[in-house]
Amino acid sequence: MIGGLFIYNHKGEVLISRVYRDDIGRNAVDAFRVNVIHARQQVRSPVTNIARTSFFHVKRSNIWLAAVTKQNVNAAMVFEFLYKMCDVMTAYFGKISEENIKNNFVLIYELLDEILDFGYPQNSETGALKTFITQQGIKSQHQTKEEQSQITSQVTGQIGWRREGIKYRRNELFLDVLESVNLLMSPQGQVLSAHVSGRVVMKSYLSGMPECKFGMNDKIVIEKQGKGTADETGKTGKQSIAIDDCTFHQCVRLSKFDSERSISFIPPDGEYELMRYRTTKDIILPFRVIPLVREVGRTKLEVKVVIKSNFKPSLLAQKIEVRIPTPLNTSGVQVICMKGKAKYKASENAIVWKIKRMAGMKESQISAEIELLPTNDKKKWARPPISMNFEVPFAPSGLKVRYLKVFEPKLNYSDHDVIKWVRYIGRSGIYETRC
């Protein structure tokens, strides 16, 4: 599938090169350097076709990873491999940098030998790789037959993401519901578009081979499966949630999710992403922005912006930032705000208003007088939207964790012996209001 894999530094020098197919020549290395890394204009597309050769590339810091092929391949699978390769390297030697790659090039070649077989991705689970590739990239010569059989069963068996014999003095399980809410609202307060992208990230430090069961809202409606509509969700309030699409970690038993709407799995060791989802129905919008812009002649603007928090008074939003755009011919700005600090940034053509914390069901406002330089340009100011950043301690989609259970029959510890933590974090994505 993948004809070759190349890792470049910011100058276009090849740090790692591995060719899997005879149809990929040395000229492919130079073609990517000239047409992508040294291109006069920034290459925005992650896929570049040069002389009937496709280059799938990602960039981490100043390092380029490029997968090359001349075949019609599954692009999503290639990018999944590239991002997984980045995660594996980060797990082994930390930050992906030129120095770290040069210091660990033997380890990287060893990883590629295990992860890719003739260009086909095989095993990219960090936990499984670490059982037979050490931190220094040197395989142990003193493995017993029992240890070797454990490695073989882990790599080829059904539970390749977790090794046997894991032991912890204290069994802990951390679950984070991380959501990004995106909004475009009209000046009159009408929602033009809104969606939430969410992830369920877990950190498991559990002994043995535990069975975990994770339950969400009383009712989950998967829109694309046709098992419910938005009306059903609205009737039951936030006891239910309508999900447009979702993907799971390979450890999840999908059959149980389809029948019971519960997530059952044997967890990998350490940190991993259990679930990723997207929803567009019944979103809780944490803030509403009410703008008022009034033109006073041709050389003055009066701006008033009110923000209202739309969540429980017991909750606190943090890291609030409102960016109010100003015209290019702005000469001066006078700002008065009820709460927080506001400053005009000429380099960004915007008034930046920052509030450290804000409780639910509160409102605050900012007023500004903007002085404008006379201009001969008859074109009216386009009035870019007001954008907002924030962080709230709840899930804007309404997703709730109802239960999180752990069973380990062999080691004889129960759900009550496990320390469990659940955290909700909602952040702004592209959160804009037209003015």
Curated annotation (Swiss-Prot):
MF GO annotations: clathrin adaptor activity; lipid binding
Database matches in InterPro entries: Adaptor_comp_med_subunit (IPR050431), AP2_Mu_C_sf (IPR036168), AP2_Mu_N (IPR043532), AP_mu_sigma_su (IPR022775), Clathrin_mu (IPR001392), Clathrin_mu_CS (IPR018240), Longin-like_dom_sf (IPR011012), MHD (IPR028565)
Keywords attached to this entry: Cell membrane, Coated pit, Endocytosis, Lipid-binding, Membrane, Protein transport, Transport
The MHD domain, residue ranges: 170-434
Topology within the bilayer: Peripheral membrane protein
Protein origin, superkingdom: Eukaryota
Residues that bind a 1,2-diacyl-sn-glycero-3-phospho-(1D-myo-inositol-3,4,5-trisphosphate): 341, 345, 354
Cell compartments where the protein resides: Cell membrane; Membrane, Coated pit
GO CC, one annotated term: AP-2 adaptor complex
Principal location: membrane
One Gene Ontology biological process: clathrin-dependent endocytosis
Function: Component of the adaptor complexes which link clathrin to receptors in coated vesicles. Clathrin-associated protein complexes are believed to interact with the cytoplasmic tails of membrane proteins, leading to their selection and concentration. AP50 is a subunit of the plasma membrane adaptor. The complex binds polyphosphoinositide-containing lipids.
UniProt similarity note: Belongs to the adaptor complexes medium subunit family.
Subunit and partners: Adaptor protein complex 2 (AP-2) is a heterotetramer composed of two large adaptins (alpha-type subunit and beta-type subunit), a medium adaptin (mu-type subunit) and a small adaptin (sigma-type subunit).
Protein name from the UniProt record: AP-2 complex subunit mu
Originating gene: ap2m1
